[in-house]
Amino acid sequence: MSCLFNSYDPYFKQPFGAVRAGQSVHLTLRIPEELGYVDPHLVIQKEGKYDVPVHYRMKFDGQTPKQNHFSVDLTLNDVGLYFYYFDLYPDFRRIVRGPDNCGVVSWQEGEKWQITVYEADFRTPETFKGKVFYQIFPDRFCEGVENKPMPFPDRLYQADKHAEPFWQPNETGGHLNEDYFGGDLKGIQLKLPYLHEMGVDYLYLNPIFEAHSNHRYNTADYLNVDPLLGTNEDFETLCKEAAKYGIGIVLDGVFSHTGSDSRYFNREGRYGEGGAYRDPNSPYRSWYDFDPKYKGGYRSWWGFETLPEVNEETPSFVEFITGKGGVIDTWLRRGAAGFRLDVADELPDAFIEKIRAAVKRVSPEKFLLGEVWEDATTKYGFGHRRTYLLGKGLDSVMNYPFKNAVLDFVKGKPAQQAAGEILSICEHYPAPAINTALNFLSTHDTERALTVIADEPANGRGREWQSGRNVSGEAYEEGMLRLRMAYAIIYTLPGLPCLYYGDEIGMQGYRDPFNRGYYCWDSHEERLKPVLAQLAQLRHSCEAFRTGALRVLRAEGGVLHYQRVGATETAEIIVNRSEHIIVEPLASGKHTEVNPMGFTIVVEENGHNPNHSYYDIQ
């Protein structure tokens, strides 16, 4: 039986994907005659405590050989998630979502399709669309000021830049992350020409605020740069110098918790006798929840006593972060292009909305990104479905589902599985959000992509097993080919590709701390750099990569073939994971060869007499 309905196919659903509130949706069913007489109804329900299913009778549109066609138009005015299927009267059969998103006939309840309805006025920064990101873990990128003194005596300087980050537990079984390789803001500034050559438009920096660990996710002072990285003036200079290369800087904001070793909490006493832990009358006391029922006597992030949680609904904390002259306002006016919110799915929607207001108050072109690991439209938290991607909160999110789909594909899983996972996110996310989603293969929180592709899974084996592991020989060579394919996909999907520092030279490592090694500036691994630079150049030159629609033409086995369709140009991408050359038909009717473990990109001008440009990047 042929497909009865597929929301990815424009024949069955228009427009594709999420819609603005008040926008019309057209749905079509294709019913085989073998099903007999049917009177199909759309059954759709908005997710909400008091919402009930609504039935729409579908009109008969005519026949084709052995098939009847029915359609319905509807307008969804209320923002939220809607779930739908089709009833086939007069009996109790229904059409539900089956494998590969195709509608199948069932006598029982089944999976439903989703429509995301977002705020009619939702916009994301135009200046970010079509651009390329580069993520830097500041302590491990480049040391611009050498032989600088440690600003605090409990920091350990690592002079050997090839050394492995500390991983062995201390005498109490903990990890203090006290080893510093000396990367700083001046070092980033020194490497701006290199980043420009790589086609980078924006830097995403892991936290730079004063904090007493090398990762700096335990903020000690929100308003000052960590002294080992430089000064506030150094940050402003970096922003100005980066702008000369067309590069903006997005900062990491950690607002769900602070450090216990901070001027706000001050458990360790580094900041005198003030702070919420030591002084019951501290102005910061109301930020935290002190109660004997908690380990250590206060609520902390996932039980880590060095990370006391803040109450993001406390008015003084909200004002400190989002008010005029507050944290957001201060850093954007110092030159930052936006913020990435750490653990955004653990922040209340109302707090995120106030952060958005603070960001957009400086400029609508400032960017607000959130860390969410799953489909951000279906995430639950605080007892309800989260709404931060529906137009009043985040501009977009980190796109972990794309990462997982792409890495699984280049490692050997079927292309149709990757295509389905990618299309699901594209369908669920508002267009302004999917066009600014951060697409990556590695981060400071995950194994490096080359390790995932070429080495064994850790499978729960600890740091002692992970330490010192690096693939070489044939495994390394094949891994680099697969990494090249993976980045070709990441650079050509909807959203903003993000290169994690060192991936371009094949750096390896399992999770923290092994994925946070110092950048090997003396590396001789050069083969991926020109490929990434060419992909960035292609993104900049072809408008289809800015906001073009995604259309999958073929996803079968080791072949992934898709288009990005823009207003004036169409880009066609064919990725061949197999070990032999394939000859693939293009949408234009022509054919192209694609090398084993390779990819080809064809850009075509839309119109009757198109020009073709072929990019077979070796």
Regions found by a protein language model. Name each.
Residues F137-D201, I208-R334, I355-R361:
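Substrate-binding/active-site clefts of carbohydrate-active enzymes
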Residues L29, I136, L195, L205, ...:
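Conserved, mostly hydrophobic/aromatic
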Residues M1-Y134:
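Glycan-association/targeting regions that enable binding to alpha-glucans and other polysaccharides
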Residues I31-E33, V132, T592-Q618:
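C-terminal beta-strand-rich structural cap/linker in extracellular carbohydrate-active enzymes
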Residues S424-E427, Y500-Y501, I505-A571, R577-H580, ...:
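Glycan-recognition and catalytic regions of carbohydrate-active enzymes
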